[in-house]
Amino acid sequence: MDLSDLVQLYSDGIPQPTITPPTQNKDELNKNNNNKNKIIRHKGGNKNNRNNKNNVDNNNNNNNNNNNNEKQNQTNVNNEKITNTETLEIKKNNNNNNNNNNNNNNNNNNNNNNKNKYNKFNDNNNKKNKRNNDDDDDKEEMKRIKLFNQRLKEIKIQESPEDIARYLEERRRRYPSKANIEAKKKEEEDARKRGELLYNNNNNSKKKQTPDKKKKLENQTSKNNNKSSTTKTELTNTTTNTSSTTNPTTDTTTTTTNVVSIQKENENQEKENNDNDNDNEPIEVPSTLEFNKFEEKPIKEVKVNTASSNKRNKKRNNPKKVKEEPQVNKFQDSLFTKLFERDISAENNIILQCFRHFANKINQINGNDKLDEKKEI
């Protein structure tokens, strides 16, 4: 129903006030009434038609409303079903999500456990591999030893009986029996007489060349200087003793004779050590008159400077300490000397034998000359 239809219904249905018409004739009244009734009928028909139309419209509207309500109900039912299904789906989805999360967590845990197991397995495998490598190395060494032993056996099998007999003879020769030891000693003595240097096989017994020889030489020179200084002091003491007892003329003669006699004694000792053949020869001592011909050399007296400066004394008494540098063996055996040690020793022995031969020849010649001189005398 529209609003216009409702307004017409309300306007038609309102009772109008009855107006008393003026008094007229009956015929006129009847005519008027008939006309009014016609109008009313016509209006009533129109109203009924309108009402019927309105009712039809209302029925249609109601039907439409019912249809709409049914549709709405169906939609509501459908919506309820949908909501129920949605809730169910949501619940299902939530459950599925929870299950998926749980499954993922379980999978992660399983993966972590598998990783840990894999790491442990790898560690164990690494340890086993190390052991296996060690075992493999040991096995390889054992194989090498076995191969080496097999080769030795093959070599021994391939050896002929002549080689074995030769080997046994060499062993018998080198065996340290009494006869072999005595023969070796004789060979060493002959080599020493020849002038050969004997080198033992023991490398520890061999003295290495070191720069300590310089120190030994310095010590020897210092000792010789000390000896010479002591001899000089003895000579001066003898001269002072003789001068105190005798005259100045006799002092010079005695000092010169003492000095000459000491020098001659030293020379004679050296000659005795060098030449054993000339021990019985007479020693000629010069007379004192020959030495008196030489001019006398005055002995200089050394004066001690007592007024020397303190600085010099301090420097002499307190010399600066020289830093001792680490000693380095300059004479180290090279690889060449180590490799060719036997050849070098053999060459040295030959060179020494040559020098020995020359020295013996020279001594023989000198001895023959001296014998000839004695025969002539």
Swiss-Prot record:
Gene Ontology MF term list: RNA binding
UniProt GO cellular component terms: nucleus
Basic residues bias spans: 311-320
Single GO BP term: box C/D snoRNP assembly
Biased composition regions of type Low complexity, renumbered to the chain: 14-24, 46-79, 93-124, 221-257
Compositional bias per record (Basic and acidic residues), positions renumbered to this chain: 182-196, 209-218, 265-274, 292-303
Disulfide bonds: none
One Pfam family this sequence matches: NUFIP1
Region Disordered, residue ranges: 10-79, 91-141, 182-257, 265-284, 289-326
Domain of life, per lineage: Eukaryota
PANTHER family: FMR1-INTERACTING PROTEIN NUFIP1 (PTHR13309:SF0), NUCLEAR FRAGILE X MENTAL RETARDATION PROTEIN INTERACTING PROTEIN 1 (PTHR13309)
Name used for this protein in its record: Putative uncharacterized protein DDB_G0274405
